[in-house]
Every structure is written in structure tokens, then in C-alpha cells.
Amino acid sequence: MARTNGTRATLDAVAAAAGVSKATVSKVLNGRPGVSGETRERVREAMRRVGYAPTTGPRDPAPAGTVQVVFDTLTNPYALHVLGGVLAGADELGAEVVTSVLRPDGGARVRPPGPAWLEQLSARGRAGLILVTSELTAEEITACHRLGLGLVVVDPLNPLDESLVSVGATNWAGGVQATEHLLSLGHRRIGYASGQDRSVPARERLHGYREALESAGVRPDPELVRFEAFAPDAGRRMTEALLDLAEPPTAVFAGSDSIAMGVLAAARGRRLRVPGDLSVVGFDDTFGTLWTDPPLTTVHQPLRDMGRVALRTTLQLARGETPDSHHVQLATRLLVRGSTAPPRRR
């Protein structure tokens, strides 16, 4: 069979014959991950049909591959803990990591991923993609599957296709643990201040909070539930609104440590003592919680382990393997420190 002249034209011919992109053909030629076994064989068969013969042998692939990690923002300790876990996992497995940030300064998103950007990642030989607290459209999910990019989502902001692989913590159980601790101290007016109400972790923690209240015979009060953002400023604003209620809470369960920092700031602004006048529980156990005044009681979630698991699972998907679980949830545990105490009698 006659060959098409030129390497670029030949790649076009192979891609057309196999029904895949040129980026996928390039991955097969160079021994890179990110292509299923079935697709890899289809490309090889197309190469035989069009008479393609590489002029050079395949390049030595990286031991594991290169993974793109996309963060919504890196301006909070949570993201840095997850990144630390991803990097540790990459070092253990011999992979490489490239990071992208959608909101570099924590403000409005400046660069949505989009299918075209995903095409560029595939062409650059990325084995897969890890998204941390970021949103995906159906079009972007389809593009990842089409390009053979292993895709794992850590703490998704929005409910996703059940077929997607996600990594998180036992948020519901953590919400129960935090609220039960406050109830055991005698609190009954317990506020919940969290991030975006569409956030999967925020909703799961809310459900745990409500479950603990109802199990204790305490009727959940919608006035005590606030959503805004996982940020200190938002935590301060939400707490001020809670403290302005006719019957303010004696304790606040913050949906993240960053929010808890804002809760503490609001308490200082009102000259309220923590925990004498207001008890506070955070969620994450990020660095700095031991150094607040007082040290913050918080729900520990294994953020570094979440990063490690996400990296390992992405590489599994890139190799065409079935992951151990489609929805990984790592255990949380309550760490009692100095920011919680029985409520003051009024």
C-alpha cells in the first residue's frame, strides 16, 4: 500500500484511519500513558493499514507520566495541603506534575479550561488531569474521555456525572462529629457557616450537622445556616449575620478552617471571648490551626492523602485500568483543642 508522504501527513492518515486525534496517535507512537488498550491496538492496526513506519524509535517514556493538576485557587491552606500530597505521590511513583490555577489571585476565574485547552494538554502528552475544588461542564468531561485523559476530581464544587472518579473525605461523618461535640458540651443554638451552597462537601457537612441535631432532639433552625464562600472574609460576614439574630448561636460550626478564621475575627470584633462566649469548630486541620488563639478545634481530613490517592488513581485511569473505587472517601476525625467549651449561662 502506498504511503502518505511526510510525518505530519502520515499522522493525519493514521488518525483518520483509527478515528482518533493526532494527539492520541502521538501518545501511542511515543509509549505515553493516557490511551486505553483497545484504542492503542486500533491505532496500531491503522498504522499497519496505511503503511506507516516510524523513522525513529519511540522515545523513552517517563516512568509514570505527566499529570496536570488544576486548582480553583492556591490562596488557601487547603489547596496547598492537597498539592503537597500530589507532589509526594508523584515522587513515589516517578510521575511529573504541572499545575494550573483558574483564579490566581482568588478573584474571578480568568481562564476556564474548555475543550480547546484540554486538546492542548493532550497534545503536550499529559497522562491525565486532576481537578481540585473546580467545576467541569459536560462538554469538558466528554473532551477528557475522547482524548483519553485520565480524570479525577478532588472535592468537586458541583455534583458530577456518577461515572467520574472523585476523591474526598467523609464529609457527612465529619459534620456529625463536629455537631455532636458541640451538643455534648451543652450547646443547642449551633450555627453552620460554609462555602458555596452548590459545593458537594458543603452540602454533605450540612447533612451531617442536621442529622446530629435531629438525633439529639434539636430542631434545625434555617436561620442558623449560612452559605457564602470558603474564605475568611466570608466567615466573618456570615458570623456577624448570625450574631445579629434575635437569638444568636452559642457555637458556630465552620465548613472550613479558612471560614473559622473569619468566625474568630468576627468574635474579636464583637469583643466576644472564644470559647467563653462563643465556641468554634473548623473543618480541614490545615497548618495554622494550632497557632490560633485559642487553638482551633477542627475536623481533620487527610488532605495530603487525598492528593496522593488522586495522583495514583489518575495514573491508573491513564493506563486504561479500572480504579479501586469510583468515589473514594477517606476518614475524618475530630481534634478537640481550645476553641470549644460549654455555653455560658444567660
Describe each model-derived feature in a short phrase:
Residues 4, 241, 245-346:
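Flexible loop/turn connectors
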Residues 1-6, 65-180:
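Alpha-helical recognition/docking segments in bacterial nutrient-uptake
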Residues 24-27, 59-82, 181, 189-196:
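Short beta-strand segments enriched in small/hydrophobic residues
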Residues 38, 72-81, 99-112, 156, ...:
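Hinge/beta->alpha junction and helix N-cap segments in small-molecule ligand-binding domains
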Residues 123-133, 191-193, 225, 246-256, ...:
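Periplasmic-binding protein-like
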